[in-house]
Amino acid sequence: MGQKVNPIGIRLGIIKDWNSKWFAGKRYAEFLIQDIKLRNDLKKKLMAAAVSKILIERPANNAVVTILTARPGVIIGKKGGGIETLRKEISDNLGVPVHLNIEEVKKPELDATLVAEGIAQQLEQRVMFRRAMKRAVTSALKAGAKGIKICVSGRLGGAEIARSEWYREGRVPLHTFRADIDYGTAESKTTYGIIGVKVWIFKGEILPQKKRSTESAQ
């Protein structure tokens, strides 16, 4: 089961946290659609900023949006002008006052989403898929990853028949719930069709919060 399911989804509430935090009741569907639309719009708008995650919280009658990015300067702009424009746009979309936070991703080589997007961009620039995968694996392990697994699927190298190619180095224990595994996907639109990229990065083990607190009490 651990091999098939989304590794972040299965660890929610154990060692991973939700990207959206709010309680809605009857407005659940409305809030969910707003979140999906906002994430898609921001991803398109901030493509050059290497956005990893967008966290959305909705305390009473306002919203807190946190953007995790490898290039915060691109979003903030000159004298913080970009961030204010973006905050107004998000506020108009959500219909409530918005507090916008920008957080820097210190090690983009260990962020599965950014690694997957990096490989996808290289494939669009006609870099050989094996070279792009090897480069990503090497830089992730140098940055301190315990293990990494990459899957690239589609008409690789313009082949007639689509196939999947895997590259794996180190440990990626998908069945171990305390294993901190980051997972990211991306699509590369090439002249031969779409190539899908999946990345799993194992960063080490985290003891679940309950276990840790009981151990410290003893």
Curated annotation (Swiss-Prot):
Record key words, sorted: Ribonucleoprotein, Ribosomal protein, RNA-binding, rRNA-binding
What the entry lists under SMART domains is as follows: KH (SM00322)
Q: Does the keyword Coiled coil apply?
A: no
UniProt keyword annotation of Phosphoprotein present: no
Any idea which GO molecular function terms this record carries?
A: mRNA binding; rRNA binding; structural constituent of ribosome
CDD domains tied to this protein: KH-II_30S_S3
The record's Pfam families line, in alphabetical order, gives: KH_2, Ribosomal_S3_C
Q: Which GO terms describe its cellular component?
A: cytosolic small ribosomal subunit
Q: Which residues form the KH type-2 domain?
A: 38-106
One Gene Ontology term of the biological-process aspect is: translation
Q: How does it assemble?
A: Part of the 30S ribosomal subunit. Forms a tight complex with proteins S10 and S14.
Q: Which PANTHER family match?
A: 30S/40S RIBOSOMAL PROTEIN S3, SMALL RIBOSOMAL SUBUNIT PROTEIN US3C
| Protein family | Belongs to the universal ribosomal protein uS3 family.
Protein task: Binds the lower part of the 30S subunit head. Binds mRNA in the 70S ribosome, positioning it for translation.
Q: What is this protein called?
A: Small ribosomal subunit protein uS3
